Amino acid sequence: KKDTEEITPMPLQRTTYIGYSDASDHGYAMAMITLKDDKMTHVVLKEFTELSVEKDFSVYEYAPSVQAQAVLPQRFIKAQSIDVEGISGATASFDRYRQALKRALNSAKTKDGQRKYFDGIFQGRSRADNHGYGIALVEIKDDRIIGVKLKEVDEKGELKDFETYPHEPSKEAHAKLPQWFVESNSPDIDNFTGATHSTDKYKEAVDNALRKALIERSLPDLIDGTYTAVSDVDSKGYSGASVTIENNMIVEVKLKEYDE
């Protein structure tokens, strides 16, 4: 069917723009578009979970979301608009894609005197270490940070429950730092005593969220998402690597070895 035909790889040049939807406890979407003569010629859509993990639609179990990610790019291109027919059962994904696409298109039409950031809620994550990584949902209005929600993901890929978390400084940092970011209107805050590592992760996550909110920004060399590859096979087996990118930065690498 025409709606699901494959598209050739996107040329990453200044005719390419990226936009992000608002984030919620169910994640967010990203849209990457290429324009030629003011027309959309290529659209790539991605969704990320509330843990800032790209959804792998090759194994994703909810069929309407899989269909939406596959079909909607061509619908947007054909209509040359965000106003297209949605996918039954995937309304939330559809709305996120449309908002991300609208913001990408608005970034292509920047003008003097505009604000620095889109209004909305944007999600960023930090680099991972042996103890996990931080996540920030940053709400922006009129170029001001008006709200911040912080999360931490542990080394098992699960959200930390700060109601029962035993390290008191980390609990206090999680509770107090959102207001510090609001008052600073930036990720540049003092470290929280006894929770330096957590503070650093939150600061990086807030910075990455703000970068997603930018109306005008340069195209990164590395596109957000998770990329997987395997080595050649020899008599002892092979290796695999999974690399996660956020805001032009490698934030996580997972390695595996497989026997022959």
Q: What label would you give each PLM region?
A:
Residues 3, 7-14, 18-117, 124-222, ...:
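Active-site- and interface-proximal helix/loop "cap" or "latch" segments in soluble metabolic
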